């Protein structure tokens, strides 16, 4: 049998030495400022930004221009209700031209596809405003629809953040509804509802200065849509409070303009922009990242980073591995002469002397056993090598199973993005290979998983890795041959991996990635 051994690339080495490195990973041209919540419409994802227009994507990973939004203005948001897409945006304000007088306007269309015959924006009108003198600047609108009610938050550092209620059937302001002040010292707000709590997210810090911007996203919560909103320390948002959700890291600065992207089955993500991506000329760029929940609070997760990992089942704690014969690591395993192992029976009396122990009988653990004192130098035992482990591997396809992680080569997986293979919201597709080889994990037409001798780029060898809201991961092949429904890697038993429909209520389909 012949194995292909691969040298570590610079990217893989970086991923090993800097785990969890945050980077704006989206492909294409994701250049935008103040993006609206990412939304799906007629086969594409869309987001709109300040100044009109926006971005679109077929898979949520590679983005390009082409989205159309009339009206200009700043910091739009979008929501779908029934057969309508409502778009809110602000005209004026924001300190532009030295003023804070602004109007929040709403329009709607039945599709966001500019090539569709149904693409036509219909004006609803002004739903909120500021006169430039009052303690509010009516920009940065954001929608929330919950329990049959449609709400809109808006505002910036110049005064209060406010919430008003709209008619979900028309998008107009409900007659007689008055704005409620809910926060200060933030802008670019958004709202969520979860488990009886309303969450108000806002962007703190400075904006619009590239790598010198200090934008960061913070949150408070309330049992009522109108507040009072407080953070995890009990500080009201009306007094400047806010629990950190995400800030800049690595070579990206100034995250702002949160937008929830709920993909279902325990997968939530959020869109935002970075004020500056230092690997893209410090331009403002779109990013999509996992959203986690901890103790009732949202936390920004990290998109999966390439590297070499143990893949551990949340169900059993056992590791995914090749189903091959176990190769022993040869170390001393016999006890030395003249004494029992620790905890063993005491020495027996010598013949003819009942109840007496010979003076020469050894006491305690003898030298020479692995539990006894060493008789020579203490030296590290090297890990088993790939060549040693693979000597017993068969050729052709090899199945997989799960077992206690024992730092064996057949339990170590290298995971790397596949160029030009597309992706899914926030990330590219990955290949999963046994470390140091090209042997790749693949889905079969029988809804099982095997490893094939070499990665070919076939869709059943491409893997989607989504972080779930509890921090574990869901692993899914891009395609299962002859199967239309999406399936996920699942622990059918403590030691048996398979492919099955993902169950968000079970640990069977949840996995962890640990550095070996």
Regions found by a protein language model. Give the residues of each.
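Bacterial N-terminal signal peptides that target proteins for export
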Residues: 1-9
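N-terminal signal peptide c-region/cleavage motif recognized by signal peptidases
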Residues: 17-19
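Beta-rich carbohydrate-recognition and catalytic domains
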Residues: 22-139, 144-186, 193-246, 264-306, ...
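Conserved positions at the start
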Residues: 32-35, 73-75, 138-140, 186-189, ...
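A structural signal for short hydrophobic beta-strand segments in well-ordered beta-sheet cores
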Residues: 37-38, 78, 143, 191, ...
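Signature of short aromatic-glycine-proline-rich micro-motifs recurring in repeat-based ectodomains
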Residues: 248-262
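Extracellular glycan-recognition/adhesion modules and their associated mucin-like linkers
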Residues: 301-334, 376-395, 407-446, 464-494, ...
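Disordered, low-complexity segments in secreted/periplasmic proteins that are enriched in proline
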Residues: 332-381
């Amino acid at each position: 049998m012949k194995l292909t051994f691969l040298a570590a690339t610079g990217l893989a080495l970086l991923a090993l030495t800097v785990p969890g490195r945050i980077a704006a990973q989206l492909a294409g041209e994701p250049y935008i400022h103040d993006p609206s919540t990412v939304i799906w419409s007629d086969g594409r994802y869309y987001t709109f930004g300040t100044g009109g227009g926006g971005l679109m994507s077929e898979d949520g990973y590679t983005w390009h221009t082409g989205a159309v939004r009339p009206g200009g203005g700043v910091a739009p948001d979008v929501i779908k209700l029934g057969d309508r897409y409502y778009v809110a945006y602000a005209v004026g304000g924001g300190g532009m031209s030295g003023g804070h007088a602004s109007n929040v306007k709403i329009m709607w269309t039945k599709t966001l596809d500019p090539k569709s015959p149904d693409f036509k924006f219909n004006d609803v009108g002004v739903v909120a405003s500021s006169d430039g003198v009052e303690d509010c600047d009516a920009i940065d609108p954001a929608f929330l629809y919950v329990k049959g009610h449609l709400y809109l938050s808006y505002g910036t550092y110049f005064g209060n953040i406010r919430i008003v209620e709209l008619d979900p059937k028309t998008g107009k302001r409900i007659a007689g509804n008055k704005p409620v002040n809910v926060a200060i010292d933030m802008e670019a707000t958004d709202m969520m509802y979860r488990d009886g709590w309303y969450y108000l997210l806002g962007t703190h810090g400075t904006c619009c200065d590239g790598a010198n911007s200090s934008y960061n996203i913070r949150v408070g919560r309330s049992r009522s849509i109108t507040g009072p909103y407080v953070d995890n320390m009990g500080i009201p948002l009306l007094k400047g409070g806010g629990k950190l959700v995400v800030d800049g890291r690595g070579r990206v600065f100034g995250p702002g303009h949160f937008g929830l992207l709920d993909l279902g089955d325990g997968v939530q993500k959020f869109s935002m922009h970075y004020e500056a991506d230092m690997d893209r000329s410090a331009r403002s760029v779109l990013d999509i990242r996992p959203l986690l929940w901890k103790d009732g609070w949202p936390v920004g997760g990290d998109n999966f980073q390439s590297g070499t990992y143990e893949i551990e089942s949340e169900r059993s704690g056992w590791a995914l591995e090749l189903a091959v014969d176990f190769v022993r690591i040869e170390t001393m395993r016999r006890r030395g002469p003249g004494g029992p192992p620790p905890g063993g029976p005491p020495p027996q009396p010598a013949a003819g002397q009942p109840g007496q122990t010979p003076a020469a009988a050894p006491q305690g653990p003898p030298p020479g056993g692995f539990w006894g004192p060493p008789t020579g130098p203490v030296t590290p035992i090297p890990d088993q090598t790939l060549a040693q482990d693979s000597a017993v591997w068969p050729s052709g396809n090899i199945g997989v199973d799960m077992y206690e992680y024992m730092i064996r080569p057949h339990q170590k997986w290298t995971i790397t993005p596949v160029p030009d293979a597309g992706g899914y919201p926030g990330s590219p597709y990955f290949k999963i290979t046994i470390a140091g080889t090209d042997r790749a994990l693949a889905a079969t037409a029988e809804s099982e998983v095997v490893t094939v001798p070499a990665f070919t780029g076939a869709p059943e060898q491409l893997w989607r890795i989504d972080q779930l809201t509890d921090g574990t991961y869901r692993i899914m092949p891009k395609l299962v041959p002859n199967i239309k429904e999406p399936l996920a890697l699942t622990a059918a038993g403590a030691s048996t991996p398979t492919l099955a429909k993902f169950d968000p209520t079970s640990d069977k389909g949840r996995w962890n990635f640990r550095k070996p």
